[in-house]
């Protein structure tokens, strides 16, 4: 990958990023509408088009019901997925929401819903858009919590959850490079204000890192 954090990702680089999953029968993409996941969907679609044979791609957006804008963002993802010739589904986290621990509860619900779609679709993997920035934040969070050596290993490129594989093809890529890729392609993306809400731990650490 290029050393310049602001260089757009090329088709050949995308093929390398996703090569581990060339032989998967089907893959679910978790797409929220933010820059990281939109870039994931865009790059995965280009990768798949470059293959003679490859996995079926299914884009899935989870609306957690926590923000009014989420439904509009899900519709925008659906429009882009249609333009990329990808099937898309929007799932909703229904029921009462907890008063505390919302991010963790939302994350657990999201993975549960995504895994359900994966199993129903015959997909072996769920691709998530975790980046190098996310990896750094995760390491810092675990360090501050006093995690041992195992905890400090942070996120793996691939791990199992809810009976399917979670794959993180962008784990070595900085967010800035994904944004540059979308800007070059003139693809819009959503801005989730909760990512800057310092009432939550990760945004607070993100502000310190920046």
Provide a role label for each language-model segment.
Residues 2-208:
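Core alpha/beta nucleotide-donor-binding catalytic domains of modification enzymes
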């Amino acid at each position: 990958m290029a050393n310049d954090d602001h260089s757009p990702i090329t088709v050949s680089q995308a093929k390398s990023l996703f090569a581990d999953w060339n032989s998967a029968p089907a893959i679910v993409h978790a797409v929220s509408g933010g820059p990281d996941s939109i870039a994931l969907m865009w790059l995965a679609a280009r990768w798949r088009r470059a293959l003679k044979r490859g996995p079926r791609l299914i884009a899935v957006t989870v609306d957690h019901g926590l923000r009014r804008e989420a439904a509009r963002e899900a519709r925008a993802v659906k429009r882009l997925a249609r333009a990329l010739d990808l099937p898309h589904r929007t799932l909703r986290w229904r029921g009462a929401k907890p008063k505390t621990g919302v991010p963790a509860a939302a994350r657990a619900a999201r993975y549960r819903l995504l895994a359900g779609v994966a199993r129903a679709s015959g997909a072996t993997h769920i691709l998530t858009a975790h980046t190098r920035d996310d990896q750094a934040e995760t390491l810092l969070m675990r360090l501050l919590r006093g995690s041992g050596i195992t905890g400090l290993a942070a996120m793996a490129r691939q791990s199992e959850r809810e009976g399917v594989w979670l794959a993180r093809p962008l784990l070595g890529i900085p967010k800035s490079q994904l944004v540059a890729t979308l800007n070059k392609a003139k693809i819009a993306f959503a801005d989730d204000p909760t990512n800057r809400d310092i009432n939550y731990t990760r945004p607070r650490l993100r502000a310190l890192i920046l």
